[in-house]
Amino acid sequence: MNMTELKGALIGCGFFAVNQMHAWKDVKGAGIAAICDRDPKRLKLVGDQFGIERRYGDAAALFADGGFDFVDIATTVQSHRALVEMAAAHKVPAICQKPFAKSLSDAKAMVRTCENADIPLMVHENFRWQTPIQAVKAVLESGAIGEPFWGRFSFRSGFDVFSGQPYLAEGERFIIEDLGIHTLDIARFILGDVATLTARTKRVNPKIKGEDVATILLDHQNGATSIVDVSYATKLGTEPFPETLIDIDGTQGTIRLSQGYRLEVTGPNGMTISDASPQLLSWASRPWHNIQESVLAIQQHWTDRLSSGGETSTSGADNLKTFALVEAAYESAANGRTVDIGAML
């Protein structure tokens, strides 16, 4: 790491943090100087793999020693609020893994704490940074299909996510909190903020506690309507994991992002088909490479914004609007009613 690079500290050396560590090695202008985990085995594993000398079993000790410009919090949700508040107390800019908080009130408090401390806070919400998602957004912004009035954001899979992350089978909440949060964020990113939401959930797999299927209807503030549908109980001939498929209808044409990263755009001048595939980074492996590339993209974005002083695309304040959609989806599924998002924020 050269002297001008921003130095980061990573807290939490679990399943997904390895992707973050790989990406930090590729980020221009930043790198990881210290790591922290309560599990000595994981600490040693990640420390040895990435050659990190400074290792801590306790976050308080890490912050007390200091010597870093930002912290990347990659722990599970239970510790997020305490760690974000610790970062704010030490005036250290923070990235926080999703789900951001245990509740919307916790999330609001964390955003407020960082605003009061005058430090940037970004939620590691990487799906909107995937190459195919950015490609859809670029087409829409070019005006090629006119004004969008309808959309569908779909993630249906039979992939076994439980072997790598067994805790996913244990929670009362599953697919909306773990995956739907990303799909809802994509819907916001592409079609704008949401006025009202209606949701239905189902549990198909009898071996898990939470819901593994969700269908969510969104009324966007700009008048567009969209459907977010997610499932881990869908058995297909060709497994699409971890692809998000997108349909957008506009006043002048349509966008279709289909399986295999095929991007079809139909407008007044006819149809074009292109390949929106992500890059396979040197450390990435299929089929995860789509997500792995977006980890690098969001961490580069954080580094650029931290250097220039601008707000990040998925700042804590912005992410409250996605987090509210998750809470609203559970509320709507429980009581069968449509939820007003504005009233929650």
From Swiss-Prot:
Binding site for Mg(2+): W24, K25, V27, A30
SUPFAM superfamilies: Glyceraldehyde-3-phosphate dehydrogenase-like, C-terminal domain, NAD(P)-binding Rossmann-fold domains
Superkingdom of origin: Bacteria
InterPro entries: Gfo/Idh/MocA-like_OxRdtase_N, Gfo/Idh/MocA_oxidoreduct, GFO_IDH_MocA-like_dom, NAD(P)-bd_dom_sf
Pathway entry: Carbohydrate metabolism
Residue sites binding substrate per the record: K98, Q165, D178, H182, Y232
Record keywords, A-Z: Carbohydrate metabolism, Magnesium, Metal-binding, NAD, Nucleotide-binding, Oxidoreductase
Catalytic activity: D-apiofuranose + NAD(+) = D-apionolactone + NADH + H(+)
Transferase keyword on record: no
A GO molecular-function annotation: metal ion binding
Binding site for NAD(+): F15, F16, D37, S79, Q97, K98, N126, Q165, P166, Y167
EC number of the protein: 1.1.1.420
Coiled coil: none
Gene3D superfamilies found in the cross-reference section: Dihydrodipicolinate Reductase, domain 2 (3.30.360.10), NAD(P)-binding Rossmann-like Domain (3.40.50.720)
Disulfides per UniProt: none
The protein's role, per its UniProt record: Involved in catabolism of D-apiose. Catalyzes oxidation of D-apiose to D-apionolactone.
Family: Belongs to the Gfo/Idh/MocA family.
Protein name: D-apiose dehydrogenase
Organism annotation: Rhizobium rhizogenes (strain K84 / ATCC BAA-868) (Agrobacterium radiobacter)
